[in-house]
Amino acid sequence: MFIAVEGIDGAGKTTLAKSLSSLLEKEGFRVFLTREPTDDIRNYEGDDVELFIKFTLDRYKHQKEIRKKLNEGFVVISDRYIRSSYAYEMKGAAAALGSEEKAKEWMDCVSNIITIRPDINILVQVDVQVGLDRISKRNGTITHFEQRERLNEALKIYNSFDWDIKVDGTDPLDKITNEVYLYLKNKIGL
């Protein structure tokens, strides 16, 4: 099973992914916890079209590792995956290509090389201000990905997707971890 945990910066994705991983391991599952972007590209900067292409290439390489772990019987949990690229690069791609519709069409085409798709997509929801407050407390600096306008745009795109489960990132961690675990248990018989 492949699970992607998505949401804006500061939503609590990493915290939830780690907590869910620990719970599943306690329940006897072998879990591979990963993240995107990988370390190979984490500090790359460029315009949104360049970033989408670079992140897709990074994901193309990453999916090989994911496929291997899935074939070995691991539950794979990814802190971000393909929907994050759409959320964060859509606005710039739309500006470059003339419309959001054209940008989505182009992004879909470029993303066709990504053949490993999550079985379960989880959205951790928080207000942009909550995300910004958490980012400031975490490291004190805001990157260009973490600007209010960019997070608002990302949140808009995230909300346009259908999700298997949405959780409130302001709820206690135990509550949202158990909520996701119960969903997985009921939905797919964990």
Swiss-Prot record:
Name the catalysed reactions: dTMP + ATP = dTDP + ADP
Name the residues that span the membrane.
Answer: none
Do you know which InterPro entries this protein is assigned to? P-loop_NTPase (IPR027417), Thymidylate_kin-like_dom (IPR039430), Thymidylate_kinase (IPR018094)
Q: Which GO terms describe its cellular component?
A: cytosol
Keywords associated with the record: ATP-binding, Kinase, Nucleotide biosynthesis, Nucleotide-binding, Transferase
* Enzyme Commission number: 2.7.4.9
Tell me one GO biological process term. dUDP biosynthetic process
- A molecular-function term among this protein's GO annotations: ATP binding
Positions that bind ATP: G7, I8, D9, G10, A11, G12, K13, T14
The Swiss-Prot or TrEMBL record describes its family as follows: Belongs to the thymidylate kinase family.
The record, for NCBIfam families, names: DTMP_kinase (TIGR00041)
Its protein name is Probable thymidylate kinase
Organism name: Thermoplasma volcanium (strain ATCC 51530 / DSM 4299 / JCM 9571 / NBRC 15438 / GSS1)
Source species taxonomy: Archaea, Methanobacteriati, Thermoplasmatota, Thermoplasmata, Thermoplasmatales
What gene name is listed for this protein?
A: tmk
